[in-house]
Amino acid sequence: MANFFIRRPIFAWVLAIILMMAGALAILQLPVAQYPTIAPPAVSVSANYPGADAQTVQDTVTQVIEQNMNGIDNLMYMSSTSDSAGSVTITLTFQSGTDPDIAQVQVQNKLQLATPLLPQEVQQQGISVEKSSSSYLMVAGFVSDNPGTTQDDISDYVASNVKDTLSRLNGVGDVQLFGAQYAMRIWLDADLLNKYKLTPVDVINQLKVQNDQIAAGQLGGTPALPGQQLNASIIAQTRFKNPEEFGKVTLRVNSDGSVVRLKDVARVELGGENYNVIARINGKPAAGLGIKLATGANALDTAKAIKAKLAELQPFFPQGMKVLYPYDTTPFVQLSIHEVVKTLFEAIMLVFLVMYLFLQNMRATLIPTIAVPVVLLGTFAILAAFGYSINTLTMFGMVLAIGLLVDDAIVVVENVERVMMEDKLPPKEATEKSMSQIQGALVGIAMVLSAVFIPMAFFGGSTGAIYRQFSITIVSAMALSVLVALILTPALCATLLKPVSAEHHENKGGFFGWFNTTFDHSVNHYTNSVGKILGSTGRYLLIYALIVAGMVVLFLRLPSSFLPEEDQGVFLTMIQLPAGATQERTQKVLDQVTDYYLKNEKANVESVFTVNGFSFSGQAQNAGMAFVSLKPWEERNGDENSAEAVIHRAKMELGKIRDGFVIPFNMPAIVELGTATGFDFELIDQAGLGHDALTQARNQLLGMAAQHPASLVSVRPNGLEDTAQFKLEVDQEKAQALGVSLSDINQTISTALGGTYVNDFIDRGRVKKLYVQADAKFRMLPEDVDKLYVRSANGEMVPFSAFTTSHWVYGSPRLERYNGLPSMEIQGEAAPGTSSGDAMALMENLASKLPAGIGYDWTGMSYQERLSGNQAPALVAISFVVVFLCLAALYESWSIPVSVMLVVPLGIVGVLLAATLFNQKNDVYFMVGLLTTIGLSAKNAILIVEFAKDLMEKEGKGVVEATLMAVRMRLRPILMTSLAFILGVLPLAISNGAGSGAQNAVGIGVMGGMVSATLLAIFFVPVFFVVIRRCFKG
């Protein structure tokens, strides 16, 4: 094939140009993201039961829905929360690769079976089914410079005019409002109701009748009488629009003609739909929209669309209102991609300089350089064909591929120059002869490197999704690299190169003259050293055994992890006050947190967005969350200004607040996989022991974890503590004896204390809700319940104290379930110096000491880490086996591949040493670096073994003579290609700033592995080849 293109160079150029054009078109169309879709697809079901406590919600809503979610394809696990705000969220997580649209449809179908079994109030509120990630893509905050504008005003405008618009954008999975839109609030006065012998039930019934929209028909509607000349719609009763109209609602007309109206027994106002949340941006009243990404959507495209839409809406905002982005994960995505692209160009420049150093011929250097854009652009075309995106992982693959793809072209050019010098042939003939010598080695190298990376593509879970990005990118680049080396590079050599003399390098002066002289002396010294080594192979095999033993020790001692942490420019702070703490107390702590960040960390913090009443641990008055946005990376130089350093200082200072727990934490490397770094542990009641037993087990586990501060830190329940609850018990026999309806009792309790949604009203053209509830002063104390009255069958007003008793109990404001069983989520982090894998192992060990019937499981990113840890050994083993089989097929020998494979531990030991010295961990990126090193180590060995084998078979050389000739001939291309690769990944290894954690994790390991593989392999490969050939003749 090479000879065909040597004779037809324009044909080769045409193919290369077509490939580059396809790649250029692909780049314009490929989406850009930080990561591909790595997190397993998830579908969430949300419902609301106004006024219900957590236990009631769990028993009447959560379990009913869960029990119908059976038989759904590819369901991995299911978790749910039920809280005392009456809300329930059930999240179903599916195996990677599941079509999220199909999953959503299946969940909706199952939900249809459960819906008729749910309370009427829940059905009336509506049940939503969304496919979205569990964490926020961004938070859009809205503040006003107008001092008269309240949070309710801002919230209502955002809810009415912005929220739905953003929800409809492509890529948006869910939009959560931090605030509430307006609602008509009827605040009942219990004393006045009793005075007029009215009940909340009377109020609700009259509102349903009088605040109603009637379809009244038409005058002259069809069928009409012959000759009818009039047709008009009839508008009869319509819904009310303002508090004045509601105040005039007639509750009762007395026999004397007097009228009791709603305003006589209640306060009517346009208030908030709920008062659960207080939002602030840098201490100013605000509203916020927490935007979650739809499953499979592109983060950058979605964020760009959101900002464009808000910019479009900005001119229509009320005077003084503006939008800010106090929490945005996308700048990190953009900058990290930019950093990798910059690294890509730096790698190309360094590789060019290495090639010019060794080749010292601009024409010769230009040939491998031309191969770089051809192969890289071609790889983009293949990524587009596979439906991939331009993301951190594919770009890492490109950076690794640069060193690999120029290798093939360098081998071709270097060998053509050598043949021209030694055989004094013109370029065309030299190229033909050269290609006949190295074509087998090129194919062998391609097979080996492909064999290393292809098994990665077949692994499951989120880890498999990461591996596939590298696998497809690198294998595509390798395949194209070999094709270019067999098609374009020979054609370029035959047309661009000029004949060179045998004294080509010796005639150079200056730096190149010194370099060539030094290198030639080194080659002679190296060849003599190899000759001596081959005379005492036993000693070196012993040294090799010690190296392998050291490799095993290093591997066992290397801490494990899933992905490295990153400074993403944002982080979160969770606030948890003691059970029963009020919203007012929580706000004071949030104000302290805001003051700390804006004053003590003003050099690093851009803004703080706080939400009172909301937390990832649940919605309650004693919970809060702060979204902290840091200043741009270029303004935060130095480790002391990194997100990790800011979080560490905040933990120390905010930990001194006595009124509650304040826990700052970093975002996970892949936001889709959770909300916090560290581990995510589910403690499960497997035997139906009950909430109290599960709580005791949780506290026991937390106590045991606290005894290991050297390994575990910030171990905490991701939930709300049990709190005092006021239990009201109705004596049904007494109630019936008094002629009181049980349904009236229930409706009165629900309305007065929890609030009842009645129906809707029209506010400025938008439908909003109408709520009835007792005014605040009538529901503050236990004795206020006794002031509630219901009317008996004979018209007498009966106080609740006549048929109820009450007492205090403890209960949870938030109940959790995992896979249909009661559970409690526990989060924590590995202590500095401890790997996440070791921390997880310790948690499992502690959990095994809990009482019988208490089980555990991992969820979120920890589930994926456990899965990846189990896959890693199999991945390395399969890669070893496949490489060996490919080499056996290439050499038609079972023994020669052994001499190649024996060199692999020499590269692995370098990866492990580098990782140990620079505090890297055994994570997914480490495994990619390890596999890359396996392939590259084998590549160097192939260059020597292939030549030695040919010299023995074609020229009849002895095994030692052939080996010495091979190492002498191949040392230059081995060092050149290895140095090119090492310098190609150097920018990754020394990177800092956005995305540097991942870049370092890849670069440091590969660089260390390549250094050791090169320095050790050039001495050990000859030993392995000679020993194997002697042991296995032929």
Curated annotation (Swiss-Prot):
Biological processes, Gene Ontology terms: xenobiotic detoxification by transmembrane export across the cell outer membrane
Protein's membrane topology: Multi-pass membrane protein
Pfam families named in the record: ACR_tran (PF00873)
Locations listed in the record: Cell inner membrane
Residue intervals on the Periplasmic side: 29-339, 386-391, 461-473, 557-871, 918-923, 993-1005
Transmembrane segments: 10-28, 340-359, 366-385, 392-413, 442-460, 474-496, 538-556, 872-891, 898-917, 924-945, 974-992, 1006-1028
Gene3D superfamilies to which the protein is assigned, alphabetical: Multidrug efflux transporter AcrB pore domain, Multidrug efflux transporter AcrB pore domain like, Multidrug efflux transporter AcrB TolC docking domain, DN and DC subdomains, Multidrug efflux transporter AcrB transmembrane domain
Topology, Cytoplasmic side: 1-9, 360-365, 414-441, 497-537, 892-897, 946-973, 1029-1034
Keywords, sorted A to Z: Cell inner membrane, Cell membrane, Membrane, Transmembrane, Transmembrane helix, Transport
SUPFAM superfamilies in the record: Multidrug efflux transporter AcrB pore domain, PN1, PN2, PC1 and PC2 subdomains, Multidrug efflux transporter AcrB TolC docking domain, DN and DC subdomains, Multidrug efflux transporter AcrB transmembrane domain
GO cellular component terms, A-Z: efflux pump complex; periplasmic side of plasma membrane; plasma membrane
Keyword Cell inner membrane belongs to the record: yes
Major location category of this protein: membrane
Keyword Disulfide bond part of the UniProt annotation: no
Reported induction: Induced by LeuO, part of the acrEF operon.
InterPro entries with a match to the protein in the record: AcrB_DN_DC_subdom, Acrflvin-R, MdtF-like
One GO molecular-function entry: xenobiotic transmembrane transporter activity
PANTHER family: MULTIDRUG EXPORT PROTEIN ACRF, PTHR32063
Family: Belongs to the resistance-nodulation-cell division (RND) (TC 2.A.6) family.
Subunit structure: Part of the tripartite efflux system AcrEF-TolC, which is composed of an inner membrane transporter, AcrF, a periplasmic membrane fusion protein, AcrE, and an outer membrane component, TolC. The complex forms a large protein conduit and can translocate molecules across both the inner and outer membranes.
NCBIfam families: 2A0602, RND_permease_1
Functional description taken from the UniProt entry: Part of the tripartite efflux system AcrEF-TolC. Involved in the efflux of indole and organic solvents.
Full protein name: Multidrug export protein AcrF
Annotated source species: Escherichia coli (strain K12)
